[in-house]
Amino acid sequence: MTMERIKIFTRSFDLRLYLNSKGLFDKLGVPVVRLTDQSADGYFHTMLKDTECDIAVNIDEDAFLTDPDAMFRLIDYVVENGYANAGCPDGGGFCPRAANPIVTNPFFNILNLKLIRTRYDRKAIRDFNYKEHKEEMIKHFPNERLETKYDFDRTEQEPYYPFFLWLAYNFRTLYLPSQRHEDGMTTILKDLEGHTLCLHTWFARFYTTPTWLVRFVDSKRGIQKKRIDAVIDQAYSIRGMERPSFGLTDRLSFIVNKIIRWIIKVPQRISRWPYKLRKKLRHRFHPDQTD
């Protein structure tokens, strides 16, 4: 495998958090791409359009790489064994969710873009009827990954569900084991040999939101920054690296960047309201129909 055919992609909203995550992989000799202002499903199509990349490492800005060597070994394993995707089940493992385990949560994925492109079709993804194939797909799911609550009937948990359901039906997915961090929230993602690949903290959207505002919106999420910072420190300690420090100019750029991101994000959110409303009405009055 040639290194230049691998790229690391991150869908990012918070520049400060992104730079903390990027600091753990930006010197690996692999091109790094920050994707901003893209939808939760659209950025996978952006990766697939990048014909200079055969293997995409998709990592969230609140996921922190702890073992690059394990990551590269996993890439080799994925390619050599004909997998299209490797990642953490969205249910049944130690994500703070109980959703559909056939879908891999995109906080960390190895995506074999070269293989996926052999059948890639956006219309086929939209038209894929999971309910018709559900029982068959469940039979092929590794039961050893079902350690906690899950729900194979969930099909609309997130916008990226259609992509990953289609992917799991048409190609092989490697489902990785996970553990719960001692903080009670962070997911520790493992490879098949038990090495820790990354630490995913969740709730990145609350990282730089004032605590008083977070508590007003969601009283249970007011301590996220302190918890996430502790995990970032842990990841850098594991790697034997010094965490990035930011000066006044950096902090100003973070503020400007966030303002720009919100200016773009709000209209995007509003534009999807009619679609979400139609979707809710359709499933209320026609629950047997698929999207």
Q: Predicted regions span which residues?
A:
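Short beta-strand-to-loop acidic/aromatic patch adjacent to the donor-nucleotide binding site
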Residues: 53-64
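C-terminal catalytic/acceptor-binding lobe
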Residues: 138-291
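Short beta-alpha junction loops
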Residues: 14, 89-93, 179-182
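Short, high-confidence coil segments that cap the C-terminus of an alpha-helix
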Residues: 53, 81-84, 171-172
